Design a protein with these regions (language model features):
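Glycine/proline-rich active-site loop of Rossmann-fold NAD(P)-dependent oxidoreductases
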Residues: 148, 160-162, 173-182, 217-227
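N-terminal Rossmann NAD(P)H-binding glycine-rich loop of SDR-like oxidoreductase domains
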Residues: 4-24
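Mid/C-terminal beta-alpha module of Rossmann-like enzyme folds, strongest
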Residues: 220-267, 301-304
């Protein structure tokens, strides 16, 4: 029985991932600051490990009994305006978790076999212009900096012989939370709008495939390094809106000028709402991972019908 410890288990991806792994008969422990919140949102079979993100020795005791660590911990990127204070929280919440996981691993005698390190396609910058594989360099912007530091926060564990996989995730589409319900709501109420010219690249992945890809990495012991967790067919932003509108039988007739979106503090307009990212999951494809939802229309129709 593979023993998995998840940091960030109560988030949108973490909750669904935890449920899937439990259903597949893995032993799952969720690390959390607030036990009550975790108990309310997670399957009752999940072991809850309350940790204050300070006591390294206590965490090391848990990791002694762990085969796989999945680190998804970090403050929500798009939930609040990017004030200086919130940007610092976004950064610190990621770096602190990674560094403390690393210190705890260094204290263990019997080390885990694998660490899956969360990241995002923001690593490539907010205007990629061309398609990015895992070999593409780091781009510009706040999210590029954050994801780079997040990835670096656990890189030392490789010197201890652990397998490490970095998952650079795109826009995850699911009906239980995340960005999808927020994106479709304006279209449902006949106020759908294209953002800017609508030509921006939108690199997405269905939540089902996000979870399946993570399990794929766990099961295939030869896999390590960087993986783009995106569907193989990114689309233009306006095509995403058009696809949702068609599924809902609604029009998209409004347009929000880019100049207005760029007024949002902290460059959030450029990096979140106008991001132009064309990202390809080359490493998953090279290792014969099969997507359940490779095309946007299939993904959107499934989510709306569910």
């Amino acid at each position: 029985m593979i023993r998995i410890t998840i940091f960030g288990a109560t988030g949108f991806i973490g909750t669904a991932l935890t449920q899937h792994l439990m259903d597949e008969k893995y032993t799952v422990t969720a690390v959390t600051r607030t036990k009550n919140k975790a108990q309310k949102s997670l399957d009752e079979r999940v072991r809850i490990f309350q940790w204050d993100y300070k006591n390294i020795s206590k965490l090391a005791e848990l990791l002694e009994q762990t085969d796989v660590i999945i680190n998804l911990a970090g403050a929500n990127i798009a939930s609040k305006l990017w004030t200086k204070k919130h940007k610092q929280k976004i950064l610190n919440s990621r770096i602190n978790a990674g560094q403390k996981i690393t210190k705890a691993i260094e204290k263990t005698k019997h080390k885990p076999q694998l660490l899956i390190q969360g990241s995002a396609i923001g690593y490539y910058g907010y205007d990629t212009k061309k398609k990015c594989t895992e070999k593409a360099p780091k781009g510009e912007g706040f999210l590029a900096y954050v994801t780079d530091e997040w990835e670096k926060s656990t890189e030392k564990i490789e010197s201890h012989g652990l397998r490490r996989a970095i998952i650079r995730t795109g826009m995850v589409l699911g009906d239980s939370g995340g960005i999808f319900p927020k994106l479709i709501k304006p279209i449902q109420y006949f106020v759908g709008a294209n953002l800017g010219h609508g030509e921006q690249g939108f690199s997405w992945i269905h939540l089902t495939d996000e979870i399946r890809a993570i399990e794929f990495i766990i099961k295939n012991h030869q896999l390590s390094g960087i993986f783009n967790l995106t569907a193989p067919n990114p689309v233009k932003s306006k095509v995403f809106n058009k696809t949702v509108a068609k599924a809902l039988n609604r029009p998209v007739w409004l347009k929000i000028p880019a100049a207005i979106l760029r007024l949002i503090p902290g460059n959030m307009g450029n990096e979140i709402f106008l991001a132009n990212q064309w990202v390809i999951p080359s490493q998953l494809q090279a290792n014969n991972f099969t997507f359940s939802f490779p095309n946007l229309s299939e993904a959107v129709n499934q989510l709306i019908k569910s």
